[in-house]
Amino acid sequence: MPTINQLVRKGRVPQKAKSKVPAMEQNPQKRGVCTRVYTTTPKKPNSALRKVAKVRLTNQREVISYIPGEGHNLQEHSVVLIRGGRVRDLPGVRYHVLRGVLDTQGVKDRKQSRSKYGAKRPK
């Protein structure tokens, strides 16, 4: 513990807050090009084939982002928009692909939570 005199001389240095989504550079969304689209398995108690894409962003950073919803049309060279938001059971996946924007189609036959999956209102 510092003495009063040490605090008078130096003072306390506030800690810097570290960003959870550094590749976004303070932007709400970023555009990028898929370099690889593949499936991966989640951490221990869960079991599935989660769809993810490696995306090269406009700032030249490569990130892994999750493709939400059932079915997708993404392949290599697809242009996507990503947002922040990690996937808890996939280590290293800190971003989500936005559905229904640019080359990504919305989820087909989606009735609830449509806005999150880029699905149009059913007739």
Swiss-Prot record:
Query: What keywords are assigned to this protein?
Result: Methylation, Ribonucleoprotein, Ribosomal protein, RNA-binding, rRNA-binding, tRNA-binding
- What are the GO cellular component annotations? small ribosomal subunit
Matching entries from PROSITE patterns are given as: RIBOSOMAL_S12 (PS00055)
| GO biological process annotation, one example | translation
Q: Can you tell which superkingdom this protein's organism belongs to?
A: Bacteria
Q: Which InterPro entries match?
A: NA-bd_OB-fold, Ribosomal_uS12, Ribosomal_uS12_bac
Please give the Pfam families that the UniProt record associates with this protein: Ribosom_S12_S23
Instruction: Indicate, by first and last residue, each region the UniProt record lists as having compositional bias (Basic residues).
Output: 9-19
Q: What is this protein called?
A: Small ribosomal subunit protein uS12
Where does this protein come from, organism-wise?
Answer: Erythrobacter litoralis (strain HTCC2594)
Q: Which gene encodes it?
A: rpsL
